C-alpha cells in the first residue's frame, strides 16, 4: 500500500498507472572509482582502488594410466578486509576457486571453420561438477586486516580474486605429472 496525503493505492495500481502513462520505473547511473590512474607509456599508476591478497595450496592425484585427476585438498587464506558477512565471503571464495579449476582443467571453447561457437551448452561445454570440489576444502579469512581505503565498513570484494588461486591446483597437477615422468622415464637399461 502506498500513501500520499489522503490518497492511497497498491503498488500494482501504481505500476500499472506508470505503464499507462509511459513513466519509466528504472534508472541508470554511473560510478567512477576514486583514486585510480594509469600511465601506459611509463607503466605506472594505481589501476585499482585497493588490492586484496590470497594464497592457496592444493593436493591432487592423477591416474597415470587414464589421465584422470582429482583434487584431494585445498587450503585457502583470503584477505577480505573487515568482512561484512563471512559466510557470503566464504561462498564467493569457494565459487571463484571452483570456477578457476574449470577454467584450468576442463573448460574449452571449440569453433567451426566459419568461426561459430560449437560448445554452446552443458552437453558440449564441460564445467566443474560436485566431484570437482575437493573433499577437504579449508578456507580461512585473514583476520584484522581492515581495508585502508574508505570502503563500506572497510570491507574488500572477494568475488573474482579467488579464481586465480586455483592455479595452485594446476601446479599440483603439473607436479604430479612430473613425478610420474620421473619414475616412468625410459632409460638405457630399458632398451631405449
Predicted regions and their residues:
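C-terminal catalytic domains of large/alpha subunits in multi-subunit enzymes
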Residues: 1-185, 189
Amino acid at each position: 500500500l502506498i500513501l500520499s496525503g489522503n490518497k492511497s493505492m497498491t503498488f500494482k495500481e501504481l505500476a500499472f498507472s506508470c505503464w499507462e502513462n509511459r513513466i519509466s520505473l528504472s534508472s541508470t547511473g554511473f560510478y567512477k572509482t576514486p583514486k585510480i590512474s594509469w600511465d601506459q607509456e611509463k607503466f605506472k599508476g594505481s589501476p585499482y582502488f585497493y588490492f586484496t591478497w590470497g594464497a592457496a595450496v592444493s593436493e591432487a592425484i592423477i591416474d597415470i594410466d587414464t589421465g584422470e585427476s582429482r583434487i584431494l585438498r585445498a587450503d585457502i587464506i583470503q584477505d577480505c578486509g573487515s568482512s561484512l558477512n563471512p559466510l557470503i565471503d566464504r561462498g564467493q571464495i569457494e565459487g571463484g576457486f571452483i570456477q578457476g579449476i574449470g577454467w584450468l582443467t576442463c573448460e574449452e571453447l571449440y569453433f567451426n571453420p566459419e568461426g561459430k561457437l560449437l560448445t554452446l551448452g552443458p552437453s558440449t561445454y564441460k564445467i566443474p561438477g560436485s566431484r570437482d570440489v575437493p573433499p577437504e576444502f579449508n578456507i580461512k579469512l585473514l583476520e584484522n586486516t581492515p581495508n585502508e581505503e574508505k570502503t563500506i565498513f572497510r570491507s574488500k570484494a572477494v568475488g573474482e580474486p579467488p579464481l586465480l588461486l586455483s592455479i595452485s591446483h594446476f601446479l599440483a597437477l603439473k607436479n604430479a605429472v612430473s613425478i610420474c615422468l620421473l619414475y616412468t622415464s625410459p632409460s638405457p637399461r630399458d632398451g631405449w
